[in-house]
């Protein structure tokens, strides 16, 4: 059995670690809310672009939403474990943090490796959407119109991409290519936007996905602090229990 003075020295250490870990867990919980919000924002703001990408790329917002939800639940569990000062719960918390960190690390690596595939996928699907375009609009035609209206662009590389489509042969350029609301006759190249959409879309996606990647990387690194704190508090509690015995 340890001396009373030894136990008195251990208790302030435990109290200190508990306070710091509670603050950390609250901030960690907030990052989960941020990731959840970023995932929802990405799903809404990039929906038109994602509709012209392959299924892997469209899963990105859902991955962020799922990760944010897991972090919120994990943060709640971590707060409970810290308040209870339970050594085994804190070890479990550290293990979950490690697992989530590894998943985020793998996801970041996969996203970096396949970033060129996303570009090629968008370009191929956009070209396909132009060839199959109809003004009454399936979801891809609607996405093309939305992108061209919003970004004031026309075609993939430039407006001439439309000249190879069936729609152009029948009706000319779509209204979404027009500089003004009405550009009749719709075969007049001077009345449509000349710039293509591909470069503009890629600039937006890279910019917004860069924000997402930066936030995700920051959250992942922040988890390392939590792993360290949870492990240290667990050790301190375990040592204190041995000292009492």
From Swiss-Prot:
It is a multi-pass membrane protein. The chain crosses the membrane at residues 20-40, 60-80, 94-114, 209-229. InterPro entries: Tetraspanin/Peripherin (IPR018499), Tetraspanin_animals (IPR000301), Tetraspanin_CS (IPR018503), Tetraspanin_EC2_sf (IPR008952), TSN6/7_LEL (IPR048232). It is found in: Membrane. The keyword Transmembrane helix applies. Keywords: Glycoprotein, Membrane, Transmembrane, Transmembrane helix. GO terms for cellular component: extracellular exosome; plasma membrane. PROSITE patterns: TM4_1. It comes from the Eukaryota. Its main location: membrane. Glycans are attached at residue 134. One of its GO terms (biological process) is positive regulation of canonical NF-kappaB signal transduction. Residues 1-19, 81-93, 230-245 are cytoplasmic. Residues 41-59, 115-208 are extracellular. SUPFAM superfamilies: Tetraspanin. Belongs to the tetraspanin (TM4SF) family. This is Tetraspanin-6. The lineage of its organism: Eukaryota, Metazoa, Chordata, Craniata, Vertebrata. The gene is TSPAN6.
């Amino acid at each position: 059995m340890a001396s009373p003075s030894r136990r008195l020295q251990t208790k302030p250490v435990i109290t200190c670690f508990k306070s710091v870990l509670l603050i950390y867990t609250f901030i960690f919980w907030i990052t989960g809310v941020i990731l959840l919000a970023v995932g929802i924002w990405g799903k809404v703001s990039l929906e038109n672009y994602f509709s012209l990408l392959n299924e892997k790329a469209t899963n990105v917002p859902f991955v962020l939403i799922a990760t944010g939800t897991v972090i919120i639940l994990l943060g709640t569990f971590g707060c409970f474990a810290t308040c209870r000062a339970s050594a085994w719960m804190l070890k479990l918390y550290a293990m979950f943090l490690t697992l989530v960190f590894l998943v985020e690390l793998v996801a970041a690596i996969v996203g970096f490796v396949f970033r060129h595939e996303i570009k090629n996928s968008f370009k191929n699907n956009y070209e396909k959407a132009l060839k199959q375009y109809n003004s009454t609009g399936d979801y891809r035609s609607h996405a093309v119109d939305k992108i061209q209206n919003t970004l004031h662009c026309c075609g993939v590389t430039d407006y001439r991409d439309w000249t190879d489509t069936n729609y152009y042969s029948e009706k000319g350029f779509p209204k979404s290519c027009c500089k003004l609301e009405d550009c009749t006759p719709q075969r007049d190249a001077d009345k449509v936007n000349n710039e293509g959409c591909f470069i503009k879309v890629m600039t937006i996606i890279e910019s917004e996905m860069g924000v997402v990647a930066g936030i995700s990387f920051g959250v992942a690194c922040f988890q390392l602090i939590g792993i360290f704190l949870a492990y240290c508090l667990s050790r301190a509690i375990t040592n204190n229990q041995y000292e009492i015995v």
